[in-house]
């Protein structure tokens, strides 16, 4: 399970869910920078989208390894942010010309330390914070999208879709039980290679809790209710990812690990994304 090589014949899919509600106007320390939660969400999403495009580049051009969808929820509704139809193939995405900006980013260096490094960043999506938080409605839409994708004959043997939800964890259209139920439905969808992976990234303004990535159960004891609920909504990371997660967390890390992170630095958030969105086998 979770071993299928990602190729142009056996493609995979990524869904990035972005909380764009009014609560994202709050400011948060993101690594060494202060910004709004909406800016942190957009920054993280833009970094992931650019990485997905870069991973598909070969000497003969961008290979069509996966479909990508970005689902925004806020302003009292759900919207597709890359393409109105939902999915966009990565080669079509690469042909777009997003706005560029320069930003100083906390980057993990080879010696394990973090340093501020200036990067040029593509802006595929822009920060937005307005209205309520229809996370349940967004999960319903994503459930149907990934189910339809997995049902297609050409995708049935593929590495399963990966859903990454970036939020401050406060839905307005459901209670905790209902959110847990719809997330369970999303995780229950599968290809022959495994179930959909649902990762939650909790953007929090708290500066009193330690940052945690791929938490174990005992690391969630001091977390707030929203973080604990998001952890229960997340996938338990498969054994195929255990070694990479152990290397990230260090000595004392023992599975099972929840597919989430909270109160994390920029470098840690990107580590979550990198591990969660990397097949354990090479792309060919």
Q: Which residues make up each language-model segment?
A:
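Acidic, low-complexity intrinsically disordered regions
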Residues: 1-284
């Amino acid at each position: 399970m979770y071993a299928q090589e990602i190729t142009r014949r056996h493609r995979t899919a990524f869904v990035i869910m972005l909380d764009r509600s009014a609560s994202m106007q709050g400011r948060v320390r993101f690594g060494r920078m202060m910004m709004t939660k909406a800016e942190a969400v957009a920054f993280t999403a833009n970094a992931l989208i650019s990485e997905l495009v870069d991973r598909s580049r070969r000497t003969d051009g961008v290979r069509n390894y996966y479909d990508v969808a970005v689902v925004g929820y806020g302003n009292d509704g759900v919207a597709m942010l890359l393409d109105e139809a939902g999915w966009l193939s990565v080669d079509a995405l690469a042909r777009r010309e997003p706005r560029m900006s320069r930003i100083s980013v906390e980057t993990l260096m080879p010696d394990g330390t973090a340093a501020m490094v200036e990067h040029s960043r593509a802006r595929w999506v822009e920060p937005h914070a307005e209205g309520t938080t229809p996370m349940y409605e967004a999960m319903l839409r994503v459930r149907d999208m990934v189910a339809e994708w997995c049902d297609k004959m050409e995708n049935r043997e593929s590495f399963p879709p990966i859903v990454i939800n970036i939020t401050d964890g406060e839905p307005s259209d459901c209670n905790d039980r209902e959110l847990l139920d719809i997330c369970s439905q999303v995780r229950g969808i599968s290809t022959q290679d495994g179930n959909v992976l649902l990762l939650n990234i909790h953007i929090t303004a708290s500066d009193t809790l330690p940052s945690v990535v791929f938490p174990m159960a005992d690391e969630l004891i001091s977390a707030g209710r929203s973080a604990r609920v998001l952890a229960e909504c997340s996938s338990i990371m498969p054994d195929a990812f255990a070694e990479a997660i152990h290397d990230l967390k260090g000595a004392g890390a023992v599975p099972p690990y929840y597919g989430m992170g909270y109160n994390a630095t920029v470098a840690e958030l990107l580590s979550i994304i990198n591990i969660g969105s990397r097949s354990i086998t090479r792309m060919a």
